[in-house]
């Protein structure tokens, strides 16, 4: 009997949710995703030291104010990490735009284009890069324009159905609906200790989005993210992609049980009918969803805080040089 991880790979593209080079080398996933939190953690390892030094040197050559050099250095670090990861996987890597720009369409466009330019200058095929952007109204508008320019996007911090509808409407390449953080909110608000996997609110959210997309012919890829346990993963077997932490990958590898497919494009059906979402509707429906409003804001704050900490680490290295 194959492990549940091997069974999952026959129906879903497995993505490693880590910036740890050694973990990616070990797991050999199809794709990989990174974010400021993962980069901050990875940057503490010696494997990242040469990349940090190269990023700082590049920023110094770029010139500009200290603040500008910091953003250049952290962008270049993300690109160098992405380049290293792409040498270990056959698919794509996702690189995130600074979360502090989540409510600024033009600034998001500028930074996204710079990331792609940095990849291009490193000799990387930019078709293997997805630009991660928070699923705010402004972020979705930026992604819509980037997709028209041939820059494929991964819309992250997605917690609500209206965000998913708006992303599909904008022609976004891929979305990352979060599972575990939705569960976290419902556990805290309900006072419950747990939910069975088949009743998990995060699983329900991703399943609803997946079935809506497939039943209505949307091409946007659904990549479930932010898992708290393997039960959530098993309930989403068959989803286009699932991005999974190394610890949960190990749990799936160690499990020799049978894994049943739960999501299938051939049998997808949805009571939700496609419609056009305008800004007023998006903001109202987002406001009415307390969980999505709170988790989106919290996610942006967390990524922004880790971005600031990453810049602090880069500044220390630059001052020591």
UniProtKB/Swiss-Prot annotation:
Keywords tagged on the record: Cytoplasm, Pentose shunt, Schiff base, Transferase
Catalytic activity line of the entry: D-sedoheptulose 7-phosphate + D-glyceraldehyde 3-phosphate = D-erythrose 4-phosphate + beta-D-fructose 6-phosphate
Catalytic center residues: 132
CDD domains: Transaldolase_TalAB
Localization, UniProt: Cytoplasm
Listed GO CC annotations: cytosol
A Pfam family reported for this protein in Swiss-Prot or TrEMBL: TAL_FSA
Pathway: Carbohydrate degradation; pentose phosphate pathway; D-glyceraldehyde 3-phosphate and beta-D-fructose 6-phosphate from D-ribose 5-phosphate and D-xylulose 5-phosphate (non-oxidative stage): step 2/3
Record EC number: 2.2.1.2
PANTHER family: TRANSALDOLASE
Subunit structure: Homodimer.
Name assigned to this protein: Transaldolase
């Amino acid at each position: 009997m194959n492990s549940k991880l091997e069974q999952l790979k026959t129906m879903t593209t497995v993505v490693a949710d880590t910036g740890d080079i050694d973990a990616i080398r070990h797991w050999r996933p199809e794709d990989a995703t990174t974010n400021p939190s993962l980069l901050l953690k990875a940057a503490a390892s010696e494997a990242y030291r040469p990349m940090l030094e190269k990023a700082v040197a590049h920023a110094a050559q770029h010139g500009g104010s200290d603040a500008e050099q910091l953003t250049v250095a952290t962008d270049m670090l993300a690109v160098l990490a992405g380049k290293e990861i792409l040498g270990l996987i056959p698919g794509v890597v996702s690189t995130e735009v600074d979360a502090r720009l989540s409510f600024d369409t033009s600034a998001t466009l500028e930074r996204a284009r710079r990331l792609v330019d940095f990849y291009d200058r490193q000799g990387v095929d930019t078709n293997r890069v997805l630009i991660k952007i928070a699923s705010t109204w402004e972020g979705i508008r930026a992604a819509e324009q980037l997709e028209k320019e041939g820059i494929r996007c991964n819309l992250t911090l997605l917690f609500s159905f209206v965000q998913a509808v708006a992303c599909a409407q904008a022609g976004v390449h891929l979305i990352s609906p979060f599972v575990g953080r939705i569960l976290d909110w419902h556990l805290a608000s309900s006072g419950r200790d747990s939910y069975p996997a088949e009743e998990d609110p995060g699983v329900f959210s991703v399943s609803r989005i997946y079935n809506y997309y497939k039943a209505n012919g949307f091409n946007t890829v659904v990549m479930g993210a932010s898992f708290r346990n393997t039960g959530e993963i098993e309930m989403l077997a068959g989803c286009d992609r699932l991005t999974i932490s190394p610890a949960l990958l190990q749990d799936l590898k160690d499990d020799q049980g049978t894994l049943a497919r739960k999501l299938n494009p051939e049998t997808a059906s949805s009571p939700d009918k496609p419609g056009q979402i305008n800004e007023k509707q998006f903001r109202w429906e987002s406001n009415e969803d307390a969980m999505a409003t709170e988790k989106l804001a919290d996610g942006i704050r967390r990524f922004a805080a880790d971005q600031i900490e990453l810049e602090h680490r880069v500044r220390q290295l630059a001052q020591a040089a």
